[in-house]
Amino acid sequence: MNTVLSVQGASAPVKKKSFFSKFTRLNMLRLARAVIPAAVLMMFFPQLAMAAQGQDLMASGNTTVKATFGKDSSVVKWVVLAEVLVGAVMYMMTKNVKFLAGFAIISVFIAVGMAVVGLK
């Protein structure tokens, strides 16, 4: 008769690496070796780095974006409706009031964000 012994879990404790172990001297040298050439190129060619002489390639789509996501668009209404439905369902599932009030907070963030970018 053969008996099988099974062990659940790891056989040896696994030590978790610290977040700060990524900031070693060797990793910082590798980062500097990658960043310094780009910084030197931007210093010698600032017009390419800052696009000082360029034209706005997205200006032609500005009216389309305002029509799609503007003040009276149906996309905004559908997003708000989806927020309300998801908040209600999550509240019913968890009985946590945070989910119920979450749609109001997200709606405020969306309204402020649209005002900042000029869509309202």
Curated annotation (Swiss-Prot):
Propeptide: 1-51
Presence of the UniProt keyword Hydrolase in the record: no
Main localization, broad class: membrane
Pfam family membership, one: TraA
Keywords: Acetylation, Cell inner membrane, Cell membrane, Conjugation, Membrane, Plasmid, Secreted, Transmembrane, Transmembrane helix
Highest taxon above the source species: Bacteria
Compartments in which it is found: Cell inner membrane; Secreted
Membrane side Periplasmic: residue ranges: 1-73
Residue positions, PTM N-acetylalanine: 52
Stretches assigned to the Cytoplasmic side: 95-98
Subunit structure: Monomer. Interacts with itself to form filaments; also interacts with TraQ.
Physiological role: Propilin is the precursor of the pilus subunit, pilin, that forms conjugative pili, the filamentous surface appendages required for cell-to-cell contact during the earlier stages of bacterial conjugation, and that retract after contact is established. Mature pilin is assembled with the help of TraQ and TraX.
Name the UniProt record assigns to this protein: Pilin
